[in-house]
Amino acid sequence: MKIAIIGSGISGLSAALILSQKHQITIFEINKRYGGHANTVQINNENTTIKVDTGFIVFNKLNYPNLVGFLKYLNVETIKSDMSFAVSARDGELEYSGSLKGMFAQKKNYFNLKFYKMLKDIIRFFIFGYKYAFNVRENENLKDYLNRCNFSDEFANDHLIPMSSAIWSCPEKEILTFPAKNLLTFFKNHQLINFLIRPKWRTVKGGSIQ
């Protein structure tokens, strides 16, 4: 049978691999490269070449069992990855990272009341999400959810929106229109609202180009 596959992201390529064992496959791709969200850029730095993933970067065994099995089937080597989060807002006016020490790496944060307001809402967000599964209404976007639950602008603009934008490679303005239920369910499933338990992240050795 002749089968056409539209798109060469992981879904298209994995389907092509399996179906090609018994059928004739043709892949249609609008871009000049295969891979979709997986894209490794090589940066030449003096005598060293650094490989940087611009899209797909990490995965974990808990949330991506099919991907883990697929990589194992292809004999793709993976390694442990260190996942961290840091923010630099308004040309360095506010800077912090996820560790306790990193929170106050910028010494003026000790005396910044707005910073403490953000931290208070981060704690409330973690507890609220873990205990009540966020209590999100149907068809409610992230902006409406944050307003309804009285989360501060400091928490939204300097923590949740930057983190969400980084995860989905999406402009900050668009993140606010995301369905709150989908976004917050992702946070819960990936244990991003758990202070103590975090998933063990892995990445493809040599970049997703492998």
Task: Label every model-predicted segment.
Residues 41-67:
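N-terminal glycine-rich dinucleotide-binding loop that anchors FAD/FMN and/or NAD(P) in oxidoreductases
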Residues 40-45, 85-89:
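Short acidic-hydrophobic surface loop/beta-edge motif
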Residues 199, 203-210:
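Short, intrinsically disordered, charge-balanced linker/junction segments flanking boundaries
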Residues 60-197:
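Mobile amphipathic helical/loop "lid" adjacent to a hydrophobic cofactor/ligand pocket
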Residues 47-56, 126, 194-199:
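Glycine-/proline-rich flexible loop or hinge segments
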Residues 2-27:
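N-terminal Rossmann-like FAD-binding beta1-loop-alpha1 element of flavoenzymes
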Residues 10-11, 32-34, 165-166:
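Short, solvent-exposed loop/turn segments at secondary-structure junctions
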Residues 20-44:
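Glycine-rich FAD pyrophosphate-binding loop
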